[in-house]
């Protein structure tokens, strides 16, 4: 037995150098083997990797190493999602150039990732801020422009008047800019958009074919695309109350069945009818101005107090010319959704009910639950949105909701006004075109030129890339590109006159919407992709990343792939065949009495205190309480809830510290073993120590097995005895179960089977004092299989063990061992036992046991004896391999 401990600090750098020198993870595009493309979402170069990165990239690495061992040509690349606001913030706060800050961070994080022992093809590495990358992004923008998939249009945006920039909805907090604190204004500005809505139905339909995606992600995308079938209804406006030039109000509704419950109309603050009414009523103008100060995020609008102002305009009910409905400007209606106008049926929509209760407009229920008396059915504070029959609806009374919708549709489609139907069936989508303009410096320049004579002129392909200037200043608010003295001033490529560059840059989601395709051939200087290569290597077979990207990144990537197909850059629609969303890494939080958060690294030892108390019944109850102290002062700390690791709560653990103390393999093993990969993993120092102990245990098993392996014959024995068969069954059973777990991405299950197998092998080693040749052979075979099973998870340790066992080459290049199916067959079978049809227990017998042996084993069961209670047995019915029934 070896007494020498495994030394991760010496071993891990050694094998990392060996892998790098031998270039064993470099992928050849012309490799004839079947391809397998595994990709984890590439990181933003913030400067440090965190434990979430360790978990994410370890999962991908296990898949990559396993598929490589199984004979696939594995593509497993890495790059950097490098444009974005943090680099500009660093420039402002630390007076460092965004480019320098970004590339310094990339260098630091790459070094950290390399210590993890990931099987990455670093030759394909790029950063999205490399001009050699965004040159091709600019080319695709121009291709999209030619194809009508990119356009410039006026859009309502959130404007920060202090920072002088457009804010995303998420950057508006309580109506103020997240950084400046200024009151946000809504403005209309020219913005570049990608026409993602062209693919709304296709993006929706294709979700059904993404059967290796999580259901929750597909549901989130379905809801975001938001297909709804309804009617477009033209409400006439009462001429006596309506501004000149306005005659009707179009609304889209999915609940045309509730038209007889209408109590008001509501329009967006920027609806043409609202703008027409404002000049004659200062209160309407003031209300519209107030609405403009609020963000445009749907979530903010949904939670804000519902407010409106009566315009004095009246709309005419489509089924009753005498029925006039008040038209309100409302803060909860957006011009971007539907037609920017709605009819309010408060009895059956909670938002509408809150509104009418505020303005005392009343409500009339028009759908009554089945079995309830319509005469007594009333609505007060809670709207009814369930199924039922129509009431208070004239010709619709008694119909179901679907029948009522159909009847309304037929009548409105045949009724006309001014030669056009009053209503028509329509499909509406919640999805809106993707606005990509950002008033930021650190992003991909949009390759167009604005000429006073020629209008918008694309930058010629020969002049790409349009490169960002490096001599920029962030002393003034707004976009540094706007303030640059020379960069934006150019000659129009069409007329030769004076012109200016577009100073908006692209949304950083554009950069990450096609990087996976670029990885297939990042050396192509002439085009974004090499068609025969990208069509061979795509789609990504297994994509791994956080569920927070379920909508925007994944949906934009799906659109972008379709747009690339339409412009000849790829030949497929879907970029990711398989999608997996891993859980977060979470940790306890600790706080001082002053409220200051404390890092786990600052803790003294943790103590668990038990106390025994007697409850009201006199029974003694034991309770446990953990206590922690601040190392520096001895102050007892408050143990807070377990939360996602974050800098703000200081509950982070530095991967460098863990890898430096325990080694990368220990960190990898812990991240995989503690919980199912789609759930959060709770960081535990004890759990890490347990993983470290298992590393040492495997090292001892490998060394002990190596001693016995010296006694093994070179050739496979003709026969194996019972002990050898047991070892081989354990090995091949584990081989089958571990691979099954990896294929299902149930890494924690695979690791549990590895532990079970390691224990079984250790037991066999403990008993193998003087092993027979067949047992020595079986132990050597089992040890080799154990090392190969561990290799995807703990590759450095596996290489050391592989060497100790006398195996040639690298385990990272070894083929996956083959399972012998005969060794998966169990020798025993467990049968349920009934007495007079009622289950009384189970009996385990040899699979080939004869009926007399089964009967004897059944009658020997204590539970059967108790059930018989001395009664004679009439007969025993045995259904082979299924069940036994004793009849008395």
Curated annotation (Swiss-Prot):
The keyword Protein biosynthesis applies. A motif ('KMSKS' region) lies at residues 644-648. InterPro entries: aa-tRNA-synth_I_CS (IPR001412), aa-tRNA-synth_Ia (IPR002300), Leu-tRNA-ligase (IPR002302), Leu_tRNA-synth_edit (IPR025709), M/V/L/I-tRNA-synth_anticd-bd (IPR013155), Methionyl/Leucyl_tRNA_Synth (IPR015413), Rossmann-like_a/b/a_fold (IPR014729), tRNAsynth_Ia_anticodon-bd (IPR009080). It is found in: Cytoplasm. Its EC number is 6.1.1.4. Pfam families: Anticodon_1 (PF08264), tRNA-synt_1 (PF00133), tRNA-synt_1_2 (PF13603), tRNA-synt_1g (PF09334). GO terms for biological process: leucyl-tRNA aminoacylation. It is an enzyme of class 6 (ligase). GO terms for molecular function: aminoacyl-tRNA deacylase activity; ATP binding; leucine-tRNA ligase activity. The keyword NAD does not apply. Its main location: cytoplasm. Keywords: Aminoacyl-tRNA synthetase, ATP-binding, Cytoplasm, Ligase, Nucleotide-binding, Protein biosynthesis. It catalyses: tRNA(Leu) + L-leucine + ATP = L-leucyl-tRNA(Leu) + AMP + diphosphate. GO terms for cellular component: cytosol. It comes from the Bacteria. A motif ('HIGH' region) lies at residues 43-53. ATP binds at residue 647. PANTHER family: LEUCINE--TRNA LIGASE, MITOCHONDRIAL, LEUCYL-TRNA SYNTHETASE. HAMAP family: Leu_tRNA_synth_B. Belongs to the class-I aminoacyl-tRNA synthetase family. This is Leucine--tRNA ligase. The lineage of its organism: Bacteria, Pseudomonadati, Pseudomonadota, Alphaproteobacteria, Hyphomicrobiales. The gene is leuS.
């Amino acid at each position: 037995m070896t007494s020498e401990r495994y030394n991760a600090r010496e071993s891990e750098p050694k094998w990392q150098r060996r892998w790098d020198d031998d270039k064993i993870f470099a992928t050849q595009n012309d490799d004839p083997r079947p391809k397998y493309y595994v990709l984890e979402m590439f990181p933003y170069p913030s400067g440090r990797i965190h434990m979430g990165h360790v978990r994410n990239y370890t999962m991908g690495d296990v898949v990559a190493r396993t598929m490589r061992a199984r004979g696939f040509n594995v593509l497993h690349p890495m790059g950097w999602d490098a444009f974005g606001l943090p680099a500009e913030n660093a420039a402002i706060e630390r007076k460092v150039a965004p480019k320098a800050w970004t590339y310094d961070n990339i260098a630091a994080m790459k070094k950290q990732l390399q210590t993890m022992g990931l099987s990455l093809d670093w030759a394909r590495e790029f950063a999205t801020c490399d001009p050699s990358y965004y040159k091709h992004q600019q080319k695709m923008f121009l291709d999209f422009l030619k194809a009508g998939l990119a356009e410039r249009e006026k859009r309502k945006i959130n404007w920060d008047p202090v920072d002088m920039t457009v804010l995303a909805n998420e950057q508006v907090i309580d109506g103020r800019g997240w950084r400046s604190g200024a009151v946000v204004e809504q403005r209309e500005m020219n913005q570049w958009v990608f026409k993602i809505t062209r693919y709304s139905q296709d993006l929706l339909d294709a979700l059904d074919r993404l059967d290796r995606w999580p259901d929750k992600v597909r549901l989130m995308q379905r809801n975001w695309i938001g297909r709804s079938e309804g009617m477009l209804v033209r409400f006439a406006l009462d001429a006596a109350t309506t501004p000149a030039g306005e005659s009707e109000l179009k609304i889209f509704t999915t609940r045309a069945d509730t038209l007889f419950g209408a109590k008001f109309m509501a329009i967006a603050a920027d609806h043409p009818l609202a703008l027409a009414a404002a000049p004659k009523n200062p209160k309407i103008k003031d209300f519209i101005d107030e609405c403009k100060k609020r963000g445009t995020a749907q979530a903010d609008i949904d939670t804000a107090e519902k407010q409106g102002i009566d315009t004095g305009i009246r709309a005419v009910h489509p089924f009753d010319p005498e029925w006039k409905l008040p038209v309100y400007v409302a803060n909860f209606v957006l011009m971007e959704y539907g037609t920017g106008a709605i009819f309010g049926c408060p009895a059956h929509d909670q938002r509408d009910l809150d509104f009418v209760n505020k303005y005392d407009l009343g409500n009339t229920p028009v759908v009554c639950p089945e079995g309830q008396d319509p005469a007594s059915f009333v609505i007060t504070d809670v709207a009814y949105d369930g199924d039922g029959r129509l009431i208070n609806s004239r010709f619709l009374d008694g119909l179901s909701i679907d029948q009522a919708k159909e009847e309304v549709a037929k009548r409105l489609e045949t009724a006309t006004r001014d030669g056009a139907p009053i209503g028509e069936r329509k499909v509406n989508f919640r999805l809106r075109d993707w606005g990509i303009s950002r008033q930021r410096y650190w992003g991909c320049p949009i390759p167009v030129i604005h000429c006073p004579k020629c209008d918008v002129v694309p930058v010629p392909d020969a002049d790409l890339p349009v490169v960002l200037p490096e001599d920029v200043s962030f002393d003034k608010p707004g976009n540094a590109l706007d303030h640059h003295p020379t960069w934006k001033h150019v000659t129009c490529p069409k007329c030769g006159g004076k012109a200016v560059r577009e100073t908006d840059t692209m949304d950083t989601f554009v950069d990450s919407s096609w990087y996976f395709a670029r990885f297939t051939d990042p050396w192509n200087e002439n085009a974004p992709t090499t068609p025969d290569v990208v069509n061979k290597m795509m789609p990504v077979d297994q994509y791994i990343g956080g569920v927070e990207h379920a909508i925007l990144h994944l949906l934009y990537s799906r659109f972008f792939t379709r747009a690339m197909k339409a412009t000849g850059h790829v030949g497929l629609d879907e970029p990711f065949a398989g999608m997996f969303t891993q859980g977060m890494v979470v940790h306890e939080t600790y706080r001082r009495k002053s409220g200051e958060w404390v890092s786990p690294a600052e803790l003294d030892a943790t103590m668990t205190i038990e106390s025994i108390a007697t409850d009201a019944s006199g029974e003694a109850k034991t309770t446990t309480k953990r206590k922690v102290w601040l190392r520096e002062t001895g102050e007892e700390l408050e143990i807070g809830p377990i939360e996602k690791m974050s800098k703000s709560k200081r509950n982070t653990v530095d991967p460098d510290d863990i890898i430096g103390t325990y080694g990368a393999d220990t960190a990898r093993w812990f991240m995989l073993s503690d919980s199912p990969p789609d759930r959060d993993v709770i960081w535990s120092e004890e759990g890490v120590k347990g993983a470290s102990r298992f590393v040492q245990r495997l090292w001892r098993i490998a060394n002990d097995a190596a001693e016995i392996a010296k006694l093994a014959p070179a050739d496979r024995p003709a026969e194996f005895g019972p002990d050898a068969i047991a070892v081989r069954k354990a090995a091949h059973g584990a081989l089958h179960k571990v691979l099954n777990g990896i294929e299902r991405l149930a890494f924690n299950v695979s690791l549990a089977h590895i532990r079970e197998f390691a224990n079984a092998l250790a037991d066999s080693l403990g008993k193998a004092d003087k092993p027979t040749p067949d047992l020595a052979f079986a132990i050597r075979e089992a040890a080799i299989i154990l090392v190969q099973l561990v290799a995807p998870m703990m590759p450095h340790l596996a290489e050391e063990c592989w060497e100790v066992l006398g195996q040639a080459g690298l385990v990272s290049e070894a083929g996956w061992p083959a399972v012998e199916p005969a060794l998966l067959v169990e020798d025993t079978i467990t049968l349920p036992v009934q007495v007079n049809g009622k289950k009384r227990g189970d009996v385990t017998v040899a699979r080939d046991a004869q009926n007399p042996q089964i009967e004897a084993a059944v009658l020997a069961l204590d539970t059967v004896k108790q059930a018989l209670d001395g009664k004679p047995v009439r007969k025993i019915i045995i259904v082979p391999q299924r069940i036994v029934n004793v009849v008395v």
